[in-house]
Amino acid sequence: MPGARVAAHLDALGPLVSYVQPPLLPSMFYVGLFFVNVLILYYAFLMEYIVLNVGLVFLPEDLDQALVDLGVLSDPGSGLYDADSELDVFDGYLE
């Protein structure tokens, strides 16, 4: 049978197309996601550095007055946040 001989001869030659590895899309997606997260962290720390170190140059001499101008403090003489003022509110309640 000549067809069987041809088929055996073709089987001996091996596959006509070499094996192609499937693409690495899922793993490459996670590699890309990792680098995007690294870039986000880099820019977050860069912004923090700029705000904390470069921004300190532009702070005024009178920090209390600057906080009043921003609306953080209502009275320049009050100073920064005082934790003892909260206790005065509860003095009558606890007795």
Curated annotation (Swiss-Prot):
Pfam families: Dexa_ind. InterPro entries: Dexamethasone-induced. It comes from the Eukaryota. Belongs to the DEXI family. This is Dexamethasone-induced protein. It comes from Mus musculus (Mouse). The gene is Dexi.
